[in-house]
Every structure is written in structure tokens, then in C-alpha cells.
Design a protein with these regions (language model features):
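A short SAM/SAH-binding and catalytic strip from SAM-dependent methyltransferases
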Residues: 187-199
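Class I SAM-dependent methyltransferase SAM/SAH-binding core
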Residues: 124-126, 130-177
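Low-complexity/repetitive intrinsically disordered segments
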Residues: 1-21, 50
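A short acidic, Gly/Pro-enriched loop at the edge of an enzyme's catalytic core
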Residues: 176-187
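Short, positively charged and aromatic/hydrophobic N-terminal segments
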Residues: 2, 19, 39-40, 56
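Conserved class I S-adenosyl-L-methionine
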Residues: 65-118, 132-136, 156, 216-237
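A short glycine-rich, Lys/Arg-flanked "PGG" loop and its adjoining helix->strand segment in the class I
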Residues: 201-213
Length: 237
């Protein structure tokens, strides 16, 4: 029923941008959940007593535990950023009101092809958070899709975008498992995301998959909170 209602409510924006409709995204998320459950059930059913008899985990048990751990991590990340959404949004609002708005646009655009047409240049902003990149790029006339795993962040992004929100396609997705077709975007941009990811390499593979041949991938990040587990950095901090 949810998928049918979503299908009725969805517009053609997704199709025009080679992006799954609301219902298709919900269906994809459902399939991913079912697949994970199937893996865990199959793994449990296939596990033998041989490993247990020797105090050794079977391969299927390892797969099951890894999948459970990943889902727990995603939930923890979503909870963390849900709590921080409003405060982080205020930081982005300050950036939008200052020189960073222009400085970041210049930084991004210097990497884009000179012969581009902004109106047809398709950009994916992964881990958009409160929407800083998606806002300044939409303001410059680009076709922007903004992705974040945390619903609260997407709500802040829409509020911060104001009138630009109608031009941005917002999607709630896991950055490591994107529901987009291969070679969809001319550029993929991200800021302050990869330090959150358990497996950045998997995320990079996905980002490259949805990037057109010859496209641009721009990732800006740092070792945030490195001082918490690195003695040398702790002294500097």
C-alpha cells in the first residue's frame, strides 16, 4: 500500500534525472532489507555443527554477524546525526551567510569541465547533511541530487534550501548502496562523510559506478576526532 501510494504521489522528476521514483526507492530499500534477512536466515540454516564442535565460527556465521554489525552501525550513525541535525544545520547556515558560499562554489567549479552546460550537468551530493553543497550548486544552475541516510538531515537541507528545494531531488539512501543506474551523474561530490563510513572503499566503488565515464569525483574530508584515539593528535588538540 505504501509503494502504491508513493507511486501515485511521485512526479516525473526522478525519471528525467535517471533517478528511481519514490516508490522504486522504497521498493529497493525493502529488497535490500529482505536480502539481508535472507542472507542471515540462509547462513544460519547452512551453518554446520562442525565449526561449533571445534570452537570455530563457520563462514555462514561470519557473514551473518558481519551483516548484523553493519545494520547496527547504520542505526547508530542515523541516531547520532539525527541528534546533531539541528546544530549542524546552524553551522551550515552560517557558512551560507558568509564567504564560504562563494569560496566553496569556486573550489568545486574549478574541477568541472570548462565546456559544460550547467543546466544539463548532473551532480550527486552524497552525505548532503543540511544541504550546503546542494544549495550552492543548485544556485549556480546545476541539476542536483542530494543523498543522506538521515531523514532529519534531509529535512534540515530542505528548510535551508528555501526556494531552491523545489529544484533539488532529495533521496534517503546508504552512501555505500546507491539506488541509481550506472553512469548517471557527471560529477559526484561529498564533504565530511567518509570518516563516518565503516567501508569507504565500498562507498567509492558505488560512487564510481554511478559516475559517467570521464566524470568528476570530489571528496573533501579529514580525520575528524582523530585525537580521541591517537596520542600524538591528542597532544596537538
Amino acid at each position: 500500500a505504501i509503494m502504491i501510494a508513493a507511486k501515485a504521489a511521485s512526479n516525473t522528476a526522478g525519471a528525467n534525472h535517471d533517478i528511481m521514483s519514490v516508490s522504486e526507492r522504497e521498493q529497493t530499500k525493502f529488497v535490500h532489507r529482505e536480502r539481508r534477512m535472507a542472507i542471515m536466515i540462509a547462513a544460519k540454516a547452512a551453518s554446520s555443527t562442525e565449526g561449533a564442535n571445534h570452537g570455530i565460527m563457520s563462514v555462514s556465521d561470519i557473514v551473518m554477524r558481519r551483516d548484523e554489525k553493519y545494520m547496527e552501525l547504520l542505526e547508530q550513525i542515523e541516531d547520532y546525526w539525527t541528534d546533531r541535525a539541528e546544530g549542524y544545520s546552524q553551522v551550515n547556515q552560517e557558512e551560507l551567510a558568509g564567504d564560504n558560499r562563494t569560496n566553496w562554489r569556486r573550489e568545486l567549479e574549478r574541477h568541472f569541465p570548462e565546456n559544460r552546460t550547467n543546466e544539463t550537468y548532473k551532480i550527486l551530493d552524497i552525505g548532503t547533511g543540511p544541504g550546503f553543497f546542494s544549495i550552492i550548486l543548485t544556485e549556480a544552475g546545476y541539476q542536483v541530487t542530494a543523498v543522506d541516510y538521515t531523514e532529519a538531515m534531509l529535512e534540515e537541507a530542505k528548510k535551508n534550501a528555501g526556494a531552491f528545494a523545489q529544484k533539488i531531488t532529495y533521496c534517503q539512501m546508504d552512501a555505500s548502496h546507491l539506488a541509481f543506474a550506472d553512469e548517471t551523474f557527471d560529477a559526484v561530490v561529498s564533504r565530511n562523510l567518509t570518516w563516518n563510513l565503516e567501508d569507504p572503499e565500498q562507498a567509492y566503488k558505488e560512487w564510481m559506478r554511478v559516475l559517467k565515464k570521464g566524470g568528476i569525483l570530489l571528496n573533501y574530508d579529514a580525520n575528524w576526532y582523530h585525537h580521541l584515539f591517537d596520542a600524538e593528535k591528542r597532544e596537538e588538540y
